[in-house]
UniProtKB/Swiss-Prot annotation:
It is a peripheral membrane protein. Disulfide bonds: none annotated. This is ATP synthase subunit alpha. The record marks 362 as: Required for activity. The keyword Repeat does not apply. It comes from the Bacteria. F-type ATPases have 2 components, CF(1) - the catalytic core - and CF(0) - the membrane proton channel. CF(1) has five subunits: alpha(3), beta(3), gamma(1), delta(1), epsilon(1). CF(0) has three main subunits: a(1), b(2) and c(9-12). The alpha and beta chains form an alternating ring which encloses part of the gamma chain. CF(1) is attached to CF(0) by a central stalk formed by the gamma and epsilon chains, while a peripheral stalk is formed by the delta and b chains. The gene is atpA. It is an enzyme of class 7 (translocase). GO terms for cellular component: plasma membrane; proton-transporting ATP synthase complex.
């Protein structure tokens, strides 16, 4: 058989032409030790803080510590199969998450991966998780109201768009209920909501999602869940993932609301990570930068200036206290970062005062300038009246022979407490709140409060039936308040006439 040189060279040329070997160059290191989801890796000299690493099995990791001869990284996923000596690759990527309208109505994990079984997100945009908060020049003072639908909050501790208002209280005092009611109340208000569940039971998160679906709120809400069974790094990252998704709407000139439920659990997850990374512990074994953990997160909530598109991001962080102790480390940190706090008290909750807001120590530092004029007109003296009632009620326990003025103050205070009670998942529009508070605080032509003759235990029913009556007979009153956002003489006259008419048909039971 004759071997022809030209044929051999042709075959070799064809083989070379089809050969397309790709050389993949990656900086790799090996694991020195791995414990509870934190790995120490040798050999990644070029790694950057916050960079993503690739562990065996495609599991991602996040660089947290950069030391002289090794790197400390948190493993973002199951870590049971990862052993000492396993190779780890640098990706050169900084952690980023999907953002955009595609996330509305979805449930995602702490890294933005869908966990609701409804397929991929198909998001067109991605953003880095850690970015700098807007500076002073880019901001504008808070001036637009963000209604919660709860009389006790909208009247006494109003919240504005772009504000950070802390909700704190012991476990089972209704903190999540306040947050969920706020989401439900903003249906149709062009407010995009983000609910971040940190370290909660999966059954609790499922219940929240069911509630939002039931009331049609899921279409403008995204739920970010890092449950109790997720690794500590996921619980630490989830709030940053949520705020990155919410910032997309803020920066495009729209309005967003983010709820962190709750930041106490994020601080615990961060403490766990820091101790495993052998960072020096401080007070209550938290690391020295636990304040910065929350401040850099909450500073990203802002009301942007007109030049920046006038968008806003409002934050409602939740903190769980132990036995009502607001002076503990994490609560005081977050109180000092936020623009006010709503304190929920277990004693009030058990007495049936729900929402169980302690009006005395709850405050909104910037929300007053965002409150509508009509609410200021009717609720101006409400906080002072309630404070006087609480003071007198404490003294009245010791004496039985009280003068008439004291008895009147106590009777008025009892009715005001009843006036502010509200059922769960029953938020009220601001104009209906104004009507109810007007009926509770203003006087008729005889100088008596409109609800003075109503027995205390029937005030809640009176308020409910009053709204039903006005909706049926005088719908124009609420409409006028909603349009003018103030109570002029004409509206007051119509409201007084309607209250007089209602007083004639309201039946006192018993």
């Amino acid at each position: 058989m004759e071997i022809r040189a030209d044929e051999i060279s042709r075959i070799i040329r064809e083989q070379i032409k089809d050969y397309g070997k790709k050389v993949e160059v990656a900086e790799t290191g090996s694991i020195l030790s791995q414990a509870d989801g934190v790995a120490r890796i040798y050999g990644l000299a070029g790694a950057a803080a916050g960079e993503l690493l690739e562990f065996p099995g495609g599991i991602r990791g996040l660089v947290l510590n950069l030391e002289e001869d090794n790197v400390g990284a948190a493993i973002m996923g199951p870590y049971e199969h990862i052993r000492e000596g396993d190779p780890v690759k640098r990706t050169g990527l900084i952690a980023e998450v999907p953002v955009g309208e595609e996330l509305l109505g979805r449930v995602v994990d702490g890294l933005g991966n869908p966990i609701d079984g409804r397929g991929p997100l198909n998001a067109k945009h991605h953003r880095k998780i850690e970015i700098k908060a807007p500076g002073i020049v880019k901001r504008k003072s808070v001036h637009e109201p963000m209604q919660t639908g709860l009389k006790a909050i909208d009247a006494l501790v109003p919240i504005g768009r772009g504000q950070r208002e802390l909700i704190l209280g012991d476990r089972q005092t209704g903190k999540t209920a306040v947050a969920i009611d706020t989401i439900l109340n903003n249906k149709g208000n062009n407010l995009y909501c983000f609910y971040v569940a940190i370290g909660q039971k999966q059954s609790t998160v499922a219940r929240v999602v069911d509630t939002l679906k039931k009331y049609g709120a899921m279409e403008y809400t995204t739920v970010i869940s890092a449950s109790a069974s997720d690794p500590a790094p996921m619980q630490y990252l989830a709030p940053y993932t949520g705020v990155t998704m919410a910032e997309y709407f803020r920066d495009s000139g729209r309005h967003a609301l983010i709820i962190y439920d709750d930041l106490s659990k994020q601080a615990v997850a961060y403490r766990q990570l820091s101790l495993l990374l052998r960072r020096p512990p401080g007070r209550e074994a938290y690391p020295g930068d636990v304040f910065y953990l929350h401040s850099r997160l909450l500073e990203r909530a802002a009301k942007l200036s007109d030049k920046e598109g006038a968008g806003s991001l409002t934050a409602l962080p939740i903190i769980e206290t132990q036995a009502g102790d607001v002076s503990a480390y994490i609560p005081t940190n977050v109180i000092s970062i936020t623009d006010g706090q709503i304190f929920l008290e277990s004693n009030l909750f058990y007495q049936g005062v729900r929402p169980a807001i302690n009006v005395g120590i709850s405050v909104s530092r910037v929300g007053g300038s965002a409150q509508i004029k009509a609410m200021k007109q009717v609720a101006g003296s409400l906080k002072l009246d309630l404070a006087q009632y609480r003071e007198l009620a404490a003294f009245a326990q010791f004496g039985s022979d009280l003068d008439k003025a004291t008895q009147e103050t106590l009777a008025r205070g009892e009715r005001l407490v009843e006036l502010l009670k509200q059922g769960q998942y029953a938020p009220l529009s601001v104009e209906k709140q104004v009507i109810q508070i007007y009926a509770g605080t203003q006087k008729d032509t005889d100088g008596q409060n409109w609800i003075r003759a109503v027995p205390t235990e029937q005030v809640v029913r009176y308020m409910r039936e009053l709204i039903e009556f006005l909706d049926a007979r005088h719908p124009g009153i609420a409409k006028a308040i909603a349009e003018k956002k103030a109570l002029d003489d004409g509206i007051r006259k119509d409201l007084d006439a309607a209250l007089r008419e209602f007083a004639g048909i309201f039946k006192i039971e018993g």
